Amino acid sequence: MYPKAKATRVCSDAARINDLPDDLLATVLSFVPTKDAVATSILSKRWRPIWKRAVNLESDCVELCAICALDCFSFILMRSSKLRVLRFKQKRCCCNLLREKWKQPDFVPLSLYRSLEAFEWIGFKGREKTEKKAAFHILRNACNLKTMAITTSNTFQENTNILIDFDRMCTNCRISIKP
C-alpha cells in the first residue's frame, strides 16, 4: 500500500517521540485536552503514568470513558483545579474490560470539593460496587454540585430505585435520570 520509505519514516518519527524524556512528554501533555492526555496511557506501559505528571490539566469540562475514569478519577480531579463539568460515557474503549469494584480515593481533591457544578453519566448501569459507589462519592463530596444527570437503559423500577438512593444523599443538587 505505502512505499517502503514512507513506512520507515513513520517508524523513525515514533522512535523520536519515544526517545524524549518523560518530563518533556508530561509538559507536552499539559497543552492538550485532558481527554487526549489521558488517552495516551494506552500507548504502552511507559506512557501509562506520564499524563498524571502533566503540570496543568486545566479544563472546565472533562469527558471520559467511565471505565477508564474510575481508574484515574482522583488524578483527574487533582490536576483539574477549575473543573466545573465532569462527564462520563459508559462505553467499551481502550481498556476493554469492566471494573468489578471501585476503590474510593483516600482523599477528596479540591476540584471535587470546591468547583464541580455539573456531573453527567451517560450509559449508567447502576452496578452496586462500581458505578453507584463512584456516583455516591461525587454526591457526598461535591459541595457545589448543582446538577447530576444520568442517562441509563435500566427499567423504570431500577431508575426509580437509583433516584431514591441518590436523593437521600443530596439535598441541594438537582438529580435527573433519563432512559
Swiss-Prot record:
Query: Mind telling me which Gene3D superfamilies this protein's record contains?
Result: 1.20.1280.50
Q: Which residues form the F-box domain?
A: 14-60
> Which SUPFAM superfamilies does the protein's record reference?
F-box domain
Q: Which residues form the FBD domain?
A: 101-152
Looking up PROSITE patterns in the UniProt record yields:
FBOX
Q: Which domain of life is it from?
A: Eukaryota
Q: Which Pfam families match?
A: F-box, FBD
Protein name, per record = Putative FBD-associated F-box protein At3g12840
The species is Arabidopsis thaliana (Mouse-ear cress)
Q: What is the lineage of its organism?
A: Eukaryota, Viridiplantae, Streptophyta, Embryophyta, Tracheophyta
